[in-house]
Amino acid sequence: MIELDGIDHVALAVRDVRRAADWYIDVLGFEPRHEGMWDGVPVFIGKGTTALALFPTHDPKPIPRPHGSITMLHLAFRTDRAGFAEAQRDLRKRGIDFHFQDHEISHSIYFRDPDGHELEITTYEF
């Protein structure tokens, strides 16, 4: 069996790497990790053990994702009860629309980044 320690990073295609990095840094508190390598692509940002690799897309139009297509559905971040409440307050303050979902075992909020990637913040403490 292959022994894994966890997911190292998730690679996201974005229309503007700098804008996307700034958004994740400002909204979710990520920090710059690795920049300037490989001609600046990708830009790595992260928070704790979570990291994103931001790659520029060559097509500025959003990619249509028909229901049922094989693709990443959303990217979920875990927090505690206090962090979950703070995330909702902060998103409201920033004018970022989100919706709440009670999953019975967890509570989640869903919203989108500037490139349309669906993000989830979830807690198992409620």
Which residues fall in each region the model found?
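Residue-level signature for short turns and capping positions that connect secondary-structure elements
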Residues: 50, 59, 124-126
